[in-house]
């Protein structure tokens, strides 16, 4: 993988210095970072409004399978989005080779894809 598409479907980053430093290191290794703006998005305790985070998830169906999708952090909040996720479209993208990874709160999304 030479490109990582970041998503932030759960909690906001408490300290953006660490993820920004990680992104700089990845760039220095030749990895292209997409959607880096999600790192600094904040709405209350979440990484954006429910609408922003849901749109970001549903756009995964359009991401090239040549890219790795990585959730920035877990925390709390993805459960609010689960009923409105376009599961069929995202599952089709995964069948086409899209890889998605995350941890913690993001596990609820991963379980929904089973």
Predicted regions and their residues:
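Active-site histidine-anchored catalytic micro-motif
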Residues: 46-59, 63-114
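ATP/NTP phosphate-donor binding region
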Residues: 1-65
């Amino acid at each position: 993988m030479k490109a990582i598409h970041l998503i932030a479907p759960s909690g906001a980053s408490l300290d953006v210095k660490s993820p920004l430093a990680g992104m700089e290191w990845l760039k220095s290794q030749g990895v292209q970072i997409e959607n880096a703006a999600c790192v600094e998005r904040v709405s209350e305790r979440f990484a954006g409004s429910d609408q922003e985070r849901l749109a970001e998830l549903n756009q995964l169906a359009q991401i090239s399978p040549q890219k790795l999708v990585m959730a920035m952090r877990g925390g709390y909040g993805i459960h609010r989005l689960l009923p409105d996720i376009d599961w069929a479209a995202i599952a089709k993208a995964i069948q086409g080779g899209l890889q998605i990874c995350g941890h913690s709160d993001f596990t609820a999304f991963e379980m929904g894809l089973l």
